[in-house]
A protein has these predicted regions:
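Catalytic alpha-helical scaffold of carbohydrate-active enzymes acting on polysaccharides/glycoconjugates
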Residues: 2-118
C-alpha cells in the first residue's frame, strides 16, 4: 500500500544503515541553544496579549497588559542564561548551534555580536 502523505515519517525504518564516525567514535552530539528572549508575544511589541504558550507557566491566561512573570522568565535567558551557557561552551571549546529568533537577536545586539564572534 502506497502512503500518499507528503512527509517521510518512516526514515530508514528497519533498515538502519551502519554508521562509521571519524576516529571510531560511537556517538555524535549536537548542542543547540534556542535564543528567543525578546521575540515572545508582549504588549510592548504591539501584540494584543502577552505570551501564553511558550513558557513554563502552564495554563496562563491572556493578559491585555504586561505579564511581568512571563517577561521575567524570558529576561532570565538574555540577562543570565545565555552568558552562563556561552561561557561554558567557550571554556571547553565546544561548538554550539544557535536557533535564534530574528526579533530577539535584533533586540539584544550584544548577544548577537558575541554569537557571531564565537
Amino acid at each position: 500500500m502506497k502512503n500518499k502523505y507528503p512527509r517521510n515519517l518512516l526514515g530508514y525504518g528497519s533498515n538502519t544503515p551502519e554508521v562509521k564516525w571519524p576516529n571510531k567514535a560511537r556517538i555524535a552530539v549536537q548542542f543547540v541553544l534556542n535564543y528567543e528572549e525578546g521575540g515572545e508575544n508582549c504588549v510592548l511589541h504591539g501584540d494584543k496579549f502577552s505570551e501564553i504558550f511558550l513558557s513554563e507557566i502552564i495554563g496562563t491566561k491572556p493578559i491585555k497588559g504586561r505579564h511581568i512573570n512571563m517577561e521575567s522568565l524570558y529576561e532570565y535567558g538574555s540577562r543570565v542564561g545565555f552568558w552562563r551557557v556561552h561561557k561554558l561552551f567557550k571554556e571547553y571549546k565546544l561548538p554550539l548551534t544557535i536557533f535564534g529568533v530574528g526579533m530577539a537577536l535584533k533586540r539584544n545586539l550584544e548577544i548577537c555580536k558575541e554569537m557571531k564572534e564565537s
